[in-house]
From Swiss-Prot:
SUPFAM superfamilies: alpha/beta-Hydrolases. It comes from the Eukaryota. It is a multi-pass membrane protein. Keywords: Hydrolase, Lipid metabolism, Membrane, Transmembrane, Transmembrane helix. This is Phosphatidylserine lipase ABHD16A. It holds the Pfam family ABHD16_N. InterPro entries: AB_hydrolase_1, AB_hydrolase_fold, ABHD16_N. Its EC number is 3.1.-.-, 3.1.1.23.
């Protein structure tokens, strides 16, 4: 009976991976009493095949889940309609509650039938035995056997806890359960006394901003967190996971962040290969509808690097909702996992982000200043201009307030706190992070990210003359035009490098630098163009085109 109950309450099993013998001898440990025999080779190399009873019951429950999701998103309109029609009276609600109760009982019966179908399937019984054994004892052998299954990630045991690093226990500087530290926006109205009357006046606007951010705003900003989209993408995500596990020998892990969210990660270790770049770990931060299963992790993988991918809170196997605080909390535990469990030094870690992933990437760069480098692909400086682009002009004040208070993705501000090498990849046909049309390359917010970074690091170089020269270079629509502008100002790269190295040797590496203070106008122009070209590379593509491996380059440094 205990096993039958486990089958009723157990997670859905999606796939049984092919047996992987790579490095088995090196990773295996003596079998413990709680370890379970491995599955026979005949059961591998296919999706899990449920029996007819389980299959049909699963279909009914999945359909009910979709209907519930549709009802949830349409509930405000349905409530308004029922109220107008007078269906919310007690005489109408009581019979409806009876119908709802009957439906719940029927669904519970379907779940029991599904459990019986699982109980009659030897594959599922073996899986649930391994899962229960792993929850009792997370030995290396049990976890190795569990990794051969792809199932509902909610039942996966936690592999790494945010408090696990010994340096954080009792530390005042580390994150608390309230979350890691974020840069807070300045008050919208400076100098205004924060009296009780002013607070009361602001309350309606604050309530409106909160409701907009937690309903429409969050789902527009992170559509990948919408359940219906995840349901539609499920077959693609399962195929992507199978590729990472079976072909790349990826290892999945669940991390517990300081806010209680569980973060779904995938690690591909290339340190045992002959390629030197395998010693570097690239942590990938996906876009607003990206998942590590099918996202930007493929670029550094093809380039031969070790890779750690993770899903935003609320995406696929990760729990929670993707607000900035939760995003930063998730990124923090991912970096801690890379350092303290995977064994990478911060100097061997590169943060690579695509699009909206630039927020967590720049937060990690700001919070972990010893990391090797940051690569931002198709990212932006600040969310407000992009949010104003897609909303009506009459909503400008509401949109600005909502973003600043609840969805403040201040990438440029965070990036300027990082002292290490940075590379920006600008898509020349980007249709997402341009504020006008894709053809208007000067409206690409990647330009503003570059200018803010250079103005912070080299303020004496990025004066009016240097800024004008860089803007002309950014306006170039082709490589030929770029080279023409570069040669017009007769940029001497050897001279630029010697000037920068001399300054660094005398004053140290910390930014901002005062280099260019006593330099001629032509010298500042040359240096500004040289620095812009070293910090930004163009890629002739739209926003969602995967970055080819040959375009994945480490940032320039002296």
């Amino acid at each position: 009976m205990a096993k039958l109950l486990s089958c009723v309450l157990g997670p859905r099993l999606y796939k049984i991976y092919r047996e992987r013998d790579t490095d088995r001898a090196a990773t295996s440990v003596p079998e413990t009493p709680t370890a379970v025999p491995a599955a026979s080779s005949s059961s591998w190399d296919s999706y899990y095949q449920p029996r007819a009873l389980e299959k049909h019951a699963d279909s009914i429950l999945a359909l009910a889940s979709v209907f519930w999701s549709i009802s949830y998103y349409s509930s405000p309109f349905a409530f308004f309609y029922l109220y107008r029609k007078g269906y919310l009276s007690l005489s109408k609600v009581v019979p409806f509650s009876h119908y709802a109760g009957t439906l719940l009982v029927l669904l519970a019966g379907v779940a029991c039938l599904r459990g019986i179908g699982r109980w009659t399937n030897p594959q599922y019984r073996q899986f649930i035995t391994i899962l229960e054994a792993t929850h009792r004892n997370q030995s290396a052998e049990n976890k190795r056997q569990l990794a051969n299954y792809n199932f509902d990630f909610r039942s996966w045991p936690v592999d790494f806890h945010w408090e696990e690093p010994s340096s954080r226990k009792g530390s005042r500087g580390g994150p608390s359960r309230r979350g890691v530290a974020l840069l807070r926006p300045e008050p919208l109205h400076r100098g205004t006394a924060d009296t009780f009357l002013n607070r009361v006046k602001k309350l309606p606007c604050q309530i409106t901003s909160y409701l907009v951010a937690h309903t429409l705003g969050r789902r527009m900003l992170y559509p990948g967190s919408v359940y219906l989209l995840q349901k539609a993408l499920m077959p693609v995500l399962l195929q992507g996971q199978a590729r990472l596990v079976e072909e790349c020998n990826g290892r999945r892990a669940k991390l517990l962040a300081c806010d209680g969210n569980e973060i779904d990660t995938m690690f591909v270790d290339r340190r045992g290969t002959a390629e030197p770049q395998g010693q570097k770990l690239v942590i990938c931060c996906e876009g607003n509808a990206g998942f590590y299963e099918v996202g930007c992790v493929s670029t550094p993988l093809e380039a031969g690097y070790s890779v750690l991918g993770w899903n935003h809170p609320g995406f696929a196997g990760s729990t929670g909702v993707p607000f900035p605080q939760n995003e930063a909390n998730a990124m923090d535990v991912v970096v801690q996992f890379a350092i303290h469990r995977l064994g990478f030094q911060p100097q061997d870690i590169v943060i690579y982000a695509w699009s909206i992933g630039g927020f967590t990437a720049t937060w990690a760069a700001m919070s972990y200043p010893d990391i090797s480098a940051v690569i931002l692909d198709a990212s932006f400086d600040d969310l407000v201009p992009l949010a104003l682009k897609v909303m009506p002009d009459s909503w400008r004040a509401l949109v600005t307030r909502t973003v600043r208070q609840h969805l403040n993705l201040n990438n440029a501000e965070q990036l300027c706190r990082f002292q290490g090498p940075v590379l920006l990849v600008r898509r020349t046909k980007d249709e997402i992070i341009t504020t006008t049309v894709p053809e208007d390359i000067m409206s690409n917010r990647g330009n503003d990210l570059l200018l803010k970074l250079l103005q912070f690091r080299y303020p004496r170089v990025m004066t009016e003359e240097g800024l004008r020269a860089v803007r002309q270079w950014l306006e170039a629509s082709s490589q030929l035009e770029e080279a023409s502008i570069y040669s017009r100002w007769e940029v001497d790269e050897d001279w630029c490098v010697s000037v920068l190295r001399s300054y660094q040797a005398e004053h140290g590496p910390d930014f901002p630098w005062s280099v260019g203070e006593d330099m001629s106008v032509d010298g500042r122009r040359q240096l500004a163009l040289f620095l812009a070209r070293k910090h930004l590379h163009n890629f002739e593509a739209t926003h969602c085109t995967p970055l080819p491996a040959q375009h994945f380059q480490m940032p320039w440094c002296l």
